[in-house]
Structure formats: C-alpha cells, structure tokens
Amino acid sequence: MLKMESTQQMASSIINTSFEAAVVAATSTLELMGIQYDYNEVYTRVKSKFDYVMDDSGVKNNLLGKAATIDQALNGKFGSAARNRNWMADTRTTARLDEDVNKLRMMLSSKGIDQKMRVLNACFNVKRVPGKSSSIIKCTRLMRDKIERGEVEVDDSFVEEKMEVDTIDWKSRYEQLEKRFESLKQRVNEKYTSWVQKAKKVNENMYSLQNVISQQQSQIADLQNYCNKLEVDLQNKISSLVSSVEWYLKSMELPDEIKTDIEQQLNSIDVINPINAIDDFESLIRNIILDYDRIFLMFKGLMRQCNYEYTYE
C-alpha cells in the first residue's frame, strides 16, 4: 500500500535533483572555462533564479498538482482525476494551450530563434561519439511523421558558390607587426633600464643606511662600555670612601652611641647604585650639619648663662 503523498514526494525530489543538476552544470562550466568562482554565490544565484522560474512559470505547482492527483487516485479517490481528464478534454482548455503555444512561438521569434531553427531543433538531435570528433545525427519522431506524410524533400541540385578570398599582403602585415614588436620591445627595455637604475639607487641608499646604523651601533657600544667603566669606578670610589670614613670614625673620641649611629648611616649607603649613594651621602651630610648646628646652639646658650661673649676670627 503506497503512502498518500509518495508521488508528491517523488515530484519534489525530482525538482530538487534538477536544481542540484543545474548547480553542478553551472560550476562545471565555469571550471572548464577557467573562471574562478565562489560556490556559495553560484549556489545562491542559481537557486534564486531556479525558484523564480519554477514558481513564475507555474511548472512547480503543475507538477505537484498532478502528483497530488495521482496520489488521490492511488488511494481510491478518483474525483480529482476525473475532473482533470474532463478539463484536458475541454475545448476551452485546448484553446488556452494553443494560445500558450502561439505565445511561446512569438517569444522565441523575438529572441532571434526563427521557424527554421525551431523546426530543425524539433526534427533532429545530435549525439556525440565519445573519444571522436564526429557525431551522429538522430531523427526525432516529428521527422519520421513528416517523412511518412511526404513533407520532406531531397534537393539534389548542387550550387557551387565561389568563395571570395581577400588578398592579404602578408609581408606588409609582418613588417607592421615587427615594427610594433620593436617599439614595444624598446619601451619595455626603457622601463626595465629605469627600474634597474631605481633599484641600484635604492640598494645604494640601503647600504649607506646600513653603514650609518653600524657606526651608530658601534658608538653606542663604546658609550655603553664607558658608562659601565664609570659606574664601576664610582662604586669602588664610594666603597673606599665609606671604609675610610668608618676607619676615621673609629679613631675619634666620640661616645659609642654616636659612633654606632653614624656607622648605621654609613652602612645604609647604596654602594651598588651611585645615584642612590649620592642621595644617601646628602642625607648623611645634612644630619651631620644639623647635629653641628644643635651643638653650636647649645654652646652659645651655655656661654650666655656664664656671662661670656664669643667672637669669630
């Protein structure tokens, strides 16, 4: 027992297969012509055109409608099939079909496809022979009917037409082509020479720039070595200065608390980084000057309490 929509599904499958065949034909034709293409774009354009033609011409609805009629007949519903049979046998339907055929003929004529071409295409088919340049011409059923009705004539007369051959001065043509070739060759050589000169100039500028860069890199390396040497010398000088001050501090008759405080400040000096070491020395000198100022103020106050005067010499 067939399903109710089996014929409609087959018709839809045939339509979809026809669309896929159209896409394959379009892409294979583009490949044979050596044209690059985007498959998605070709697929979209062919689908849009195919859907429009099938829908606008009514072919899709006609096929699906006939398939639906067949499904109904297969399932025991012959009313639609009877109506279609009566419609096909109606004189009005025949007149409409005849009118459509006439419209199609006029449309073909407007496209440049005249009666001779239409008749010949309807009477003959060409079959290609694989692997050969020759082909086989096959007569259609229409051609057989015309032969049976005596509508085919054989023309045995042979008309010899003289073929007019234009005399071509190949020598002058060759000379013209040779002049054009020499002119083109000269222009190409001039452009090539100009390009070579520009390329040489660019190479010279590039080599000159490379030499300048190399010299600058050498100078930078020398300056870097000099800076490293200065930094090492400063580190050694700062370390020697700290050691000398510590030794001198130990030889002084200062209290141990003061010596310890000064030693801590000396030990906090950054011997590695000269910039930080200078800042540390500045802080140490400021502290020493501040302590000296305080001692001087204390000494000045003490002398006033003892009714003494002081002078600088």
Curated annotation (Swiss-Prot):
Residues 150-206 are annotated as: Dimerization. Residues 1-149 are annotated as: RNA-binding. Disulfide bonds: none annotated. Residues 170-234 are annotated as: Interaction with ZC3H7B. This is Non-structural protein 3. Plays an important role in stimulating the translation of viral mRNAs. These mRNAs are capped but not polyadenylated, instead terminating in a conserved sequence 'GACC' at the 3' that is recognized by NSP3, which competes with host PABPC1 for EIF4G1 binding. The interaction between NSP3 and host EIF4G1 stabilizes the EIF4E-EIF4G1 interaction, thereby facilitating the initiation of capped mRNA translation. It is found in: Host cytoplasm. The lineage of its organism: Viruses, Riboviria, Orthornavirae, Duplornaviricota, Resentoviricetes. Residues 208-313 are annotated as: Interaction with host EIF4G1.
